[in-house]
């Protein structure tokens, strides 16, 4: 698992980018968040933990949890 924070999120389109502690920003989609029984207000600046998944376009964040 990696740590970071939401650097950008578009509520209308449902995607954004997470600023990693090390490395480049990583793409995510709303559906990649694990809500664990409660709603999470996804907004710029929230701290998150996530796993990286390799795609044909690079890496994306998955299994994202608010810290």
Curated annotation (Swiss-Prot):
Q: Does this UniProt record's set of keywords contain Glycosyltransferase?
A: no
Keywords assigned by UniProt? Answer: Antiviral defense
InterPro entries cross-referenced by the UniProt entry:
Cold_shock_CspA, CSP_DNA-bd, NA-bd_OB-fold
Please report the stretch or stretches of sequence annotated as the CSD domain: 1-66
Annotated GO molecular function terms are:
nucleic acid binding
A Gene Ontology biological process term: defense response to virus
Q: Does the keyword Cell inner membrane apply?
A: no
What task does this protein carry out? Probable cold shock-like component of antiviral defense system retron Se72, composed of a non-coding RNA (ncRNA), a reverse transcriptase (RT) and this protein. Expression of retron Se72 confers protection against bacteriophage lambda. At multiplicity of infection (MOI) of 0.02 cultures slow growth when infected with lambda but do not collapse, at MOI 2 cultures enter growth stasis.
> What is the protein name for this chain?
Retron Se72 cold shock-like protein
Name the species this protein comes from.
Salmonella heidelberg (strain 579083-10)
């Amino acid at each position: 698992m990696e740590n970071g924070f939401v650097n950008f999120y578009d509520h209308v389109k449902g995607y954004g980018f997470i600023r990693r502690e090390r490395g480049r920003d990583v793409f995510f989609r709303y559906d990649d968040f694990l809500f664990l029984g409660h709603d999470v207000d996804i907004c710029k600046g929230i701290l998150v933990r996530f796993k990286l998944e390799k795609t044909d376009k690079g890496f994306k964040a998955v299994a994202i949890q608010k810290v």
